[in-house]
Amino acid sequence: MSHKHLLFIPAYNCEKQIVRVIKKISSSKLLTNFSEILIIDNCSEDNTVEVANKEILELNLKQARVVQNNDNYNLGGSHKTAFNYAVEQKYDYVSILHGDDQGDINDLGKVFENQVFENYDCMLGSRFNRNSKLINYPKFRIYANLAINLVASIVTFKFLSDLGSGINMFKVDYLKNKFYLNFPDDLTFNYSLIFYIAHSKASFFYFPITWSEDDQVSNVKLFSHAYRWVIILIKFIFNKKALFVNYELRKKDYFFNDL
């Protein structure tokens, strides 16, 4: 059975890395699985858009295109833009691969193999799976992530081995009620998303990935990020509605422009 499958690539100030990402996709055996490759630029201040378009043309990657958010929606907002697009264009599945070249497109092969994805709502890449490979990843961040994964697993009664890697796949039917519009636009979007997945009793599994840090520039401010994580955790424990329902955010529009 064939499926209409979107590959979404969020990009922000990654002119060096996005070229490598596009090259890897163009040479991947998984390329034919994607009906469209949508690179969503979040108002980059460098030449991300220009170099991405140039690489797409040079490689004749016909199903790929670069668009740009109407405003800087942050990483979470870019996800909302892509999810809305996948729902409205009646895609069956949407995969996510960050444009900073930390993840590897070929890791999705574990999900495409024997069409495993047909049996689940969410397929989540895990940096901390026993079969995953971390390259140049700081030890203190490994331990910090393992700690928050453990806490999240305890409060959700689900085994959660990663609360937000940059490579995932979702069944679009699962996204149709647009629950994700309630979540923050910032880098904690994935925390809320994973907590919702666990709470909603969605079918999901984690798959191992290779994750590398080379010349990427992190946008994470550790202390403010940790504070927001604690707030999300408290809301999940004591007031799930405060975490999963945000009428103001649901009113916000998320649009992109073709370039």
What residue spans do the PLM features occupy?
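Hydrophobic helical membrane-anchoring modules
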Residues: 1-2, 157, 181-259
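Cell-envelope/extracellular polymer assembly enzymes that use nucleotide-activated donors
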Residues: 4-6, 36, 192
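Short, well-formed alpha-helical segments that are part of the catalytic scaffolds
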Residues: 14-29
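Acidic helix N-cap motif at the loop->helix transition within catalytic regions
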Residues: 16-19, 46-55
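Short beta-strand/loop segment that forms part of the nucleotide-sugar
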Residues: 33-44, 67-68
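A conserved acidic beta->alpha catalytic loop
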Residues: 41-50, 101
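Acceptor/aglycone-binding surface of glycosyltransferases and processive sugar-polymer synthases
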Residues: 69-88, 93, 105-187, 214-224
